[in-house]
């Protein structure tokens, strides 16, 4: 007891007697006092974890402390099993490269009209640059003079691949973006060679689903006046984070830098209300997406449960032979196939599952679901290009970009 009292007196005297104390010293002394002097026992691990977590949260919405169990949990990968989805073990499906097992990044590449190519890029993955180059080569063979790149649902990916693909459209030695932070060296990412499509009209489609590396790519083409940007403002995700592991399996994920466009705009959307800085990528031509179907509760329910995909796949499998005989080409299918009868099967399945719907629901989403079913059957018969050719009938940004491409 006497020793404890002496320790308390010594610590109090030391703290009071220090003319200056650094924040780090204050933090260490506070931790020492709580662990060693508090009246009740303290679980050191829980106490430290709790306060580290709160410290990280106070920095920004993205810096965080990862407890050991959280740090071990990686992102779900294609091919991972999902236990007990509707009573059965499911496996994530995605078209992958047979050699690398990496997901394909180009969803579709086709001629949108006689001279305009269209490429839908879902992510900036390991194979994305090679896929884009191959798509450009094939489209050029088909007479492509201008190109539209669709990034509306591109969530980003590897920034070095964004630079590599931008290099196909920009002249040599141009800044694509800059990474800058107070405690890390500034790094400027530049083009380094002659690209495949440095001339010819270029449009990039963006929206709220355009994030991170996709925003950097679009901003570079915009800032260098290389592409016309069409759609809605991008998401605004432009932070660089590092993960610092601890020996116990926990880790800190901390923001260390920000990405800036060639004209110096920070991509990151402000997360402090009073900040009024510019952010993201603003389109040159603002075009709102077609989202009316999403306001239908019934549509959201059947989409979540996968009713359209199930019905369309079953129909395509059961009628594949007769469909291929009737529609001998992809073009013939797109022009003449009517999916209204399949829509009636969706309604019947919905009723069987007890999903309620109103006339208002139908008014909001019927036309979209009918088109979606046609696209899904088309994908089964002719592949992804057919799916996108059908669904892009409702792609407002694409329609505007095509109109802009033809303007003198």
What is each PLM-predicted segment?
Residues 1-21:
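Bacterial Sec-dependent N-terminal signal peptides
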Residues 7, 67-70, 339:
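Helix N-cap / beta->alpha transition motif
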Residues 7-8, 98, 191:
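Composition-driven detection of intrinsically disordered, low-complexity segments
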Residues 21, 28-111, 390-402, 408:
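Extended, small/polar residue-biased N-terminal targeting/export presequences
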Residues 21-31, 104-148, 152-408:
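C-terminal "post-core" interaction segments
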């Amino acid at each position: 007891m006497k020793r404890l009292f002496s320790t308390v007196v010594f610590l109090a005297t030391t703290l009071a007697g220090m003319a200056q104390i650094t924040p780090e010293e204050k933090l260490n002394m506070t931790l020492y006092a709580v662990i060693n002097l508090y009246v009740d026992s303290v679980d050191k691990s829980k106490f430290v974890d709790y306060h580290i977590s709160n410290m990280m949260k106070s920095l920004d919405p993205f810096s965080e402390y990862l407890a050991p169990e959280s740090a071990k949990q990686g992102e779900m990968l294609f091919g991972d099993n999902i236990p007990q989805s509707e009573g059965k073990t499911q496996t994530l499906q995605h078209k992958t490269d047979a050699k690398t097992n990496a997901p394909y990044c180009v969803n579709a590449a086709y001629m949108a009209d006689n001279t305009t190519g269209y490429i839908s890029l879902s992510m900036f993955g390991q194979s994305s640059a090679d896929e884009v180059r191959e798509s450009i080569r094939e489209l050029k063979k088909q007479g492509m003079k201008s190109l539209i790149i669709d990034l509306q649902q591109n969530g980003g990916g590897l920034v070095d691949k964004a630079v590599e693909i931008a290099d196909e459209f920009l002249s040599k030695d141009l800044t694509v973006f800059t990474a800058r932070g107070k405690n890390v060296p500034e790094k400027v990412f530049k083009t380094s060679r002659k690209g495949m499509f440095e001339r010819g009209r270029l449009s990039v489609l963006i929206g709220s689903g355009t994030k991170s590396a996709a925003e950097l790519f679009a901003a570079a083409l915009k800032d260098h006046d290389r592409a016309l940007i069409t759609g809605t403002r991008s998401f605004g995700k432009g932070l660089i984070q590092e993960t610092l592991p601890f020996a116990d399996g926990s880790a800190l994920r901390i923001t260390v830098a920000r990405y800036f466009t060639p004209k110096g705009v920070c991509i990151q959307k402000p997360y402090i209300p009073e900040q009024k800085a510019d952010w993201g990528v603003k389109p040159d031509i603002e075009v709102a997406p077609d989202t009316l179907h999403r306001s239908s509760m019934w549509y959201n329910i059947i989409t979540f449960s996968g009713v359209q995909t199930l019905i369309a796949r079953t129909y395509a499998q059961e009628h594949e032979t007769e469909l291929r005989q009737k529609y001998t080409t992809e073009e013939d299918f797109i022009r003449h196939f009517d999916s209204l009868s399949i829509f009636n099967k969706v309604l019947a399945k919905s009723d069987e599952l007890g999903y309620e719907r109103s006339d208002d629901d139908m008014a909001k989403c019927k036309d979209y679901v009918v088109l979606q079913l046609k696209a899904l059957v088309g994908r089964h018969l002719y592949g992804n290009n057919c799916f996108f050719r059908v669904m892009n009938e409702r792609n407002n940004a694409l329609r505007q970009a095509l109109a802009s491409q033809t303007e003198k």
